[in-house]
Amino acid sequence: MIDQLSPTDFAAWQAAAAPKTAVVLDVREPWELQTASITADGFELLHIPMQSLPGRMADFKQQHAADQPIACLCHHGIRSMQVANYLAQHGFTAVVNLQGGIQAWAEQVDPSIAQY
């Protein structure tokens, strides 16, 4: 079962991940990333579109430990939940889904982020 993480709880989750660096995996398409994006602040921000992840999984596994704290992000939280489940099926044990996606992040954390 993948935990749902609200944007307002992200800072506490990130702090709890220490000393490991948390990863935010943004699975949106490149045009979406250009429209609206969060800024890496004490975490690694990684962009791999959902459809590209299977082909990049071997590299992803080499670069990230199975217990690496990973929060998956998309527009509304649906694609990211699918990716979170995919990562869990591939042995990642500290995966959460950013509930509501970047839309919720813009509404609850950073209103300067464009909404689309």
Task: Walk through the language-model features, giving the residues of each.
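Short cysteine clusters
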Residues: 74
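Rhodanese-like catalytic fold shared by cysteine-dependent sulfurtransferases
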Residues: 1-23, 27-70, 78-116
